[in-house]
Amino acid sequence: MRKLLIILLCSPIIVFGQNLAVGDTYEGGIIFYLDGNGGGLIAAPTDQATVNDFPDWGCIGTAISGADGLTLGTGAQNTIDIENGCTTSGTAADICSNLVLDGFSDWFLPSIGELEIMYLNIGTGSNIGNFVNTKYWSSTEKDETYAWSWEFSSGYQDYNSKTSNKYVRAIRAFSNITNINKQQISIEKKIIKIFDVFGRESNNKNQPLFYFYDDGSVEKKIIIE
């Protein structure tokens, strides 16, 4: 079974005399990850594609070589590989790749691991990133038919047809991302149902929920806000 490696690091760091922390506005967006060595990831302050103009992943039927990076630090290369392997304009990756915001033009579509960290650090609680409770595309391809997305309403990954239309939030990196401590979560399985302790279907936060997957496994999670 494939695994997704992630990290949560919220400690302030010093960059060129500045004391930076997750949630700060910096270089065109909102910091959602710091590596402790002067590097980090920034989310654009608003969605690049919304309900009135939201794209598909693109190029269904084609497996994009190299666009399967799962972890922190892989979204940029995923986006490059998608742009090279899928010439369709207006796709999720294409929108991010062509974004120019506050003078920065190095934006990209986040990997599924980067999306999860973005959700956990600036998407829950006070929702600093002002995300919508819906699915956002990642740059992580599953195969020629499906790509991974992150559900911001309940906090889990899913894979969807590349023809599906979803929200998009671009990100960019500052300095070189290093010192990535990792933990494992499952990626190669799909949620079928979510139940509360009384057996009712629920996506409510701040309570124990049971996630039932298509491989027969069950996980108990609590998403705190």
Residue ranges and their predicted role:
Residues 210-225:
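C-terminal tail/sorting-segment detector
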Residues 178-179, 206, 218-221:
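Short, compositionally biased serine/threonine- and acidic-rich segments at solvent-exposed termini, linkers
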Residues 175-200:
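Residue-level detector of functionally pivotal "anchor" positions at catalytic/ligand-binding pockets or at interdomain
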Residues 3-17:
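Sec-dependent N-terminal signal peptides
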Residues 24, 28, 35, 89-91, ...:
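C-terminal, surface-exposed recognition/capping segments
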Residues 35-108, 112-113, 117-121:
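Short aromatic-cysteine micro-motif
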Residues 18-38, 200:
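N-terminal module-boundary/linker segments of secreted carbohydrate-active enzymes
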